[in-house]
Amino acid sequence: MEELVSVILAAGLGKRMKSKYPKVVHKVCGKPMVKWVVEAAQEAGSKEVIVVVGHGREMVEEVLGDEVKYAYQKVQLGTGHAVMMAEEFLPLEGMVLILTGDTPLITSDTLRKLVEYHISEGNDVTILSSIFDDPTGYGRIIRDESGNVVKIVEEKDASEEEKRVKEINSGMYVVDIAKLRAALKEITNDNAQGEYYLTDAVEIIRNMGGKIGAVVGESEEIIGVNSRVQLSNAEKVMRRRINEKHMENGVTIIDPDSTYIDAEVEIGRDTVILPGTILQGKTKIGEDCEIGPNSRIVDSTIGNGCNVMYSVVLSSSVGNNVKIGPFAHIRPESVIKNNVKIGDFVEIKKSVIDEGSKVPHLTYVGDAELGKNVNMGCGSITVNYDGKQKHKTIIGDNVFVGCNVNLVAPVKIGNNAYIAAGSTITEDVPEGALAIARSRQTNKEGWVEERIKKGRL
């Protein structure tokens, strides 16, 4: 097979997005639009990908890194001009796949079929087209009586008969590189917009005796994203694809329409995802878990057999057989080890909770290390901030912390120690000790009756 390279047009600003960011870096299911297109091209067999950048080039380059080459279109003078900017990176011969960076729904399967058809038919240009019930706004593919592609006509230039054609041009092509180079030398900007159109290059190749063909693709794949509404539509389609992929791999998703899973999330088999769940970033969920309802997990690892209910987990690691929630908040850089319980209205911040420990309810643990089999009583907190710096609390194994305890950091609690309820601990507690730091109770008998007599109650 001839060498295949790709050129992705990603220089436009996207005015209808009404954004300070270039259109193609807006995300669909957690991944920038242009990255979806790059990956589709690579999976379709492209040996090299050239991305034409313009507005916000630094942001596009930051998103894609060094996995692609960049051509710079300083002034946006049309699709043909954009391809001209990439010409220096093209090999002398072979095939070039020309794509647009705002079509995140295009799949590698469709691109492979496009390339295979191009080769099998011996075409010089093969257009990816689609059939739209309402083709308004798109260029039309005009065929002769034998079904051969005659031309692409823009809607503004189409006759009434041509406007009734429902086969539209997606703006994506496979082109013979040698023929493309020759055509680019011939195209002009002699039009109302003063731009160089790639469709003119297609017409020039045809007039040079080149063979033009078209492959009809799925309409949802070629829809470009030019507005926030179209972005949300693309997100909906991609979300459906992602959810279906997980279900095909053995994950139960109770209500796919209310479940939001990013592109790079991994989920083990026999895990159940309940409604209202949001899984983002590079999150990894193990097997036999139950996630949700109404939970959000971002860039975190969750082990096997875990339950996360009505809770948020951010950039943290969770072991096996851990119960989280309802209404818990696991903040970044936390490590929750195996068989731990994090209960309702608990916040864990940048802390390690070792195996078998329980933080059942109404507790704040920040900048702390909890040993194995620790029990944190209701309302106990680590007092980690002195107004300027954060300090560490270290709790040993098998420690029992009573209710409403303040552990004022920096402080260490030895193994097997007990902390009496209501205590404010400001000094280290030795191993095996009982620490009590509270006022002694005083009962004043008859106090109420006396106050009543004096009219004070």
UniProtKB/Swiss-Prot annotation:
EC number(s) given by UniProt: 2.7.7.23, 2.3.1.157
Active site: 361
Subunit (UniProt): Homotrimer.
Keyword DNA damage among record annotations: no
Source organism of the structure: Caldanaerobacter subterraneus subsp. tengcongensis (strain DSM 15242 / JCM 11007 / NBRC 100824 / MB4) (Thermoanaerobacter tengcongensis)
Name of this chain's protein: Bifunctional protein GlmU
HAMAP family, per the entry: GlmU
Function of the molecule: Catalyzes the last two sequential reactions in the de novo biosynthetic pathway for UDP-N-acetylglucosamine (UDP-GlcNAc). The C-terminal domain catalyzes the transfer of acetyl group from acetyl coenzyme A to glucosamine-1-phosphate (GlcN-1-P) to produce N-acetylglucosamine-1-phosphate (GlcNAc-1-P), which is converted into UDP-GlcNAc by the transfer of uridine 5-monophosphate (from uridine 5-triphosphate), a reaction catalyzed by the N-terminal domain.
Location in or out of the cell: Cytoplasm
Gene Ontology terms for molecular function: glucosamine-1-phosphate N-acetyltransferase activity; magnesium ion binding; UDP-N-acetylglucosamine diphosphorylase activity
Region (N-acetyltransferase): 250-457
InterPro entries the UniProt entry points to: Bifunctional_GlmU, GlmU-like, GlmU/GlgC-like_hexapep, GlmU_C_LbH, Hexapep, Hexapep_transf_CS, NTP_transferase_dom, Nucleotide-diphossugar_trans
Lineage: Bacteria, Bacillati, Bacillota, Clostridia, Thermoanaerobacterales
Ligand binding (UDP-N-acetyl-alpha-D-glucosamine): 9-12, 23, 73, 78-79, 139, 154, 169, 226, 331, 349, 364, 375
